[in-house]
Amino acid sequence: MNQILNAQRLIQLSQFHPKLKNIWYLVAAATFSVCNEPQEIPKLYHYAMLLSNDNAHMYRFTLASQTIDLLRSELPMRKTLINENYQQPTFFQKQLTAKFREVILKTGPLAGLPRAINGLTMLKETTPDILVPHLDPIDPWEAAMGNSSPLSETSMRRKHDKTIQERDHTIQNGLRHWNSIYNKVSTRVVNNLNSSYPDLWYYTLVHVYGPLFAFDEILSAQETSLVIIASLVPQDVNPQLRGHLKGALNIGCDKETVEAVRGLAILISQWCGVSWKSGVVKL
């Protein structure tokens, strides 16, 4: 499998722009996932985990090299080393792990479920065992007969809507999030989707914006907005990217941060061999 990130590039990403100090790794993870380079995600994850330690900024190059060496080791030894490094993960490291998962999940409807599956699988294989949820196996055959649950509800971060009222609440959250992003053009964009195919708007609202994009218990609304921009940059979809660049401003991101996210996603896309038909739209 092609290897794109080395120690020097990890440092380059981490120092790309001061405004991205606490989100560069999430922006990068989304971009690599969309570019179908999931093998790079563990490097971002472990480098960000190591940088969270006290005084880590003083040893950026050493930690970047350690990250590359760790993930280059053979699988049994690699897993042992990972578990030894994180016997007592900090609150921030637990939070960081959850954010990486959430970022990749949110790329699913933007770039395709298969790529999100590949990214989350690669992340799981290099996550310390202590930070991997311990779940009872799901039996889809029994669940299809109504004899067991098809969901690990106690471990899910999202609440499973069991009543009409709960479903309506999720949809309303999705609409509020949508209106915050699209603002003055919200009505026009909704009716453009609806007139293209009513089921397109239904899917967008009920299955994407409601339960996924509006969910802010792991990523903030601003973080989600920036991750969406990073996910759109490699795909040569300027109409959608233009809307989300403006939407990020509407939802509270400052212009310099939005432009930095766009720039970082372009750099990573170029590393991945992406080309664009007519350039990448900007604010």
Curated annotation (Swiss-Prot):
Protein's recorded name: Peroxisomal protein 2
Keyword tags: Cytoplasm, Peroxisome
A Pfam family the protein falls into: CMD
UniProt KW Cytoplasm keyword: yes
SUPFAM superfamilies reported in the protein's UniProt record: AhpD-like
Taxonomic source organism: Saccharomyces cerevisiae (strain ATCC 204508 / S288c) (Baker's yeast)
Compartments where located: Peroxisome matrix; Cytoplasm, Cytosol
Gene name of the record: PXP2
Gene Ontology molecular function terms on file: peroxiredoxin activity
Entries under InterPro entries matching the protein: AhpD-like (IPR029032), CMD-like (IPR003779), PTS1_Protein (IPR052999)
Principal location class: other
Effect of disrupting the coding gene: Impairs growth on oleate as well as on the non-fermentable carbon sources ethanol and acetate. Leads to increased level in threonine, serine, valine, isoleucine and histidine; as well as a reduction in citrulline, tyrosine and phenylalanine.
Biological function: Probably involved in peroxisome formation or maintenance as well as in amino acid metabolism.
Domain notes: Peroxisomal targeting signal 1 (PTS1) is a tripeptide located at the C-terminus of more than 95% of all peroxisomal matrix proteins. The prototypical PTS1 is the terminal tripeptide SKL (serine-lysine-leucine) but the consensus of PTS1 is defined as [S/A/H/C/E/P/Q/V] [K/R/H/Q] [L/F]. However, this description of the PTS1 consensus must probably be expanded beyond the terminal tripeptide.
GO cellular component: cytosol; mitochondrion; peroxisomal matrix; peroxisome
Family, per entry: Belongs to the PXP2 family.
Additional note from the record: Present with 1890 molecules/cell in log phase SD medium.
Motif range (Peroxisomal target signal 1 (PTS1)): 281-283
